[in-house]
């Protein structure tokens, strides 16, 4: 009786260990092939921004992953796209509480926009809610949400309407319309200063304006006066408006105080970097951050720090090591039960059965060795091929965007 009870306890313990192991593997499945001792390399950066604590938020992997990087340059967490969260994030900001807000765009039929929304994540990257949703017109390929600015406990987002630009504050639950003429057809991106209630916008024909109540908006920058200039994303912070210039491959800096309005200067990177990469986006609140297809650039005045990868935080390293250990235990347990079963079959059945089992065992062993040897290479090739195709797609989209801007410039 005591021997039987001992077996039952062993069975219960093994069952609990199996359930715990399966839970750990399922919870960490997205980190299964991440080496905890190597830096996490960006695959295709779409956007980056900073917060007041020095942390950086990066949209990576073709808009499907959000990364939070600590002030000392370590990866804290990663949130992945899903039907229960976001599908394709195009902008990211963090409020004073550490909550993260995403501009989520849902695409259908290749390039047509089905809907847009503002998705709220917790400071740990967990989905909380969708705080705003905008249905797109059928067949539309242009975004209606054209900017986001973080607040202490929420976010302000700008949305194109027939009447102009609708500025909504989720913290206060308020909204206001700025009557910009032909906003839906003209405006590419907006920035907003909450302190002065000022709206800035860049148009498809390469001009940057500040909204005025007079109906004649103030022209701050005209790309027609600068050969090759194509201003793209804009962002405002502390009296200065910044714009990513995808034509000249630098950052336009426009002081917006009374004394310096209309003057501009530029933040530029080394020529070798200009030849390889373009800073498509810039975000000023918190920390001035720009991003290229491959990297993130943190600015400090004229100086900058560029990085393509980040080491994992200590917590993530421990979690990954635990995940690998659990996987090793599961593999060992499966092999143990397989060997035990094989021994039982060998003892119980005939020589023919023994021979068959031996052959099957050899085949399984060879297959396991083959898969274990070639799978990492196959995974690497698959990732590289997917990455190359995505880069080609992004490059094609950017070229199309540039052509559209140029054509719009001619039209206006």
What are these regions (language model features)?
Residues 61-62, 109-114, 160-162, 246-247:
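Short, solvent-exposed loop/turn segments at conserved positions within beta-propeller repeat blades
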Residues 298-326:
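Short, aromatic-rich amphipathic segments at membrane interfaces
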Residues 65-67, 116-119, 163-167, 207-209, ...:
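A short loop-to-beta-strand structural motif that recurs across blades of beta-propeller domains
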Residues 38-64:
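Beta-strand-rich domains and repeat architectures in extracellular enzymes and scaffolds
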Residues 354-376:
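Internal/C-terminal transmembrane anchor helices
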């Amino acid at each position: 009786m005591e021997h039987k009870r001992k077996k039952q306890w062993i069975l219960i313990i093994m069952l609990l260990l199996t359930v715990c192991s399966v839970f750990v593997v399922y919870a960490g499945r997205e980190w299964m092939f991440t080496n905890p001792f190597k830096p996490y390399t960006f695959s295709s950066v779409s956007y980056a921004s900073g917060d007041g604590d020095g942390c950086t938020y990066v949209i990576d992997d073709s808009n499907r992953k959000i990364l939070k990087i600590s002030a000392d340059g370590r990866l804290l967490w990663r949130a992945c796209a899903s039907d229960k969260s976001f599908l394709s994030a195009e902008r990211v900001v963090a409020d004073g509480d550490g909550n993260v807000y995403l501009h989520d765009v849902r695409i259908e039929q290749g390039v047509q926009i089905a809907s847009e929304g503002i998705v709220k994540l917790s400071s740990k990257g967990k989905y909380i809610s969708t705080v705003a949703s905008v249905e797109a017109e059928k067949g539309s390929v242009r975004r209606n949400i054209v900017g986001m600015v973080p607040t202490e406990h929420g976010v302000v987002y700008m949305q194109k309407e027939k009447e102009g630009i609708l500025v909504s504050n989720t913290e206060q639950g308020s909204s206001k319309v700025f009557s910009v003429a032909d906003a839906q057809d003209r405006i590419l991106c907006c920035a907003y200063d909450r302190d002065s209630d000022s709206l800035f916008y860049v148009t498809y024909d390469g001009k940057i304006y500040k909204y005025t109540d007079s109906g004649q908006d103030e022209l701050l920058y005209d790309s027609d006066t600068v050969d090759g200039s194509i201003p793209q994303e804009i962002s405002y912070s502390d009296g200065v408006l910044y714009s990513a210039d995808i034509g000249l491959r630098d950052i336009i800096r426009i002081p917006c105080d009374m004394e310096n309005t209309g003057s501009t200067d530029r933040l530029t990177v080394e020529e070798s970097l200009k030849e390889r990469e373009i800073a498509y986006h810039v975000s000023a609140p918190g920390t001035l951050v720009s991003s290229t297809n491959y990297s993130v650039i943190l600015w400090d005045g004229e100086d900058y720090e560029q990085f393509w990868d980040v080491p994992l935080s200590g917590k993530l390293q421990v979690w990954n090591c635990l995940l690998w250990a659990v996987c090793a235990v599961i593999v060992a347990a499966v092999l143990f039960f397989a060997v035990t079963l094989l021994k039982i079959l060998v003892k119980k059945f005939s020589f023919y059965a023994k021979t068959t089992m031996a052959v099957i065992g050899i085949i399984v062993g060879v297959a396991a060795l083959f898969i274990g040897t070639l799978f990492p290479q196959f995974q690497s090739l698959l990732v590289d091929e997917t990455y190359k195709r995505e880069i080609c797609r992004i490059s094609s989209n950017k070229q199309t965007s540039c052509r559209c801007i140029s054509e719009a410039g001619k039209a206006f």
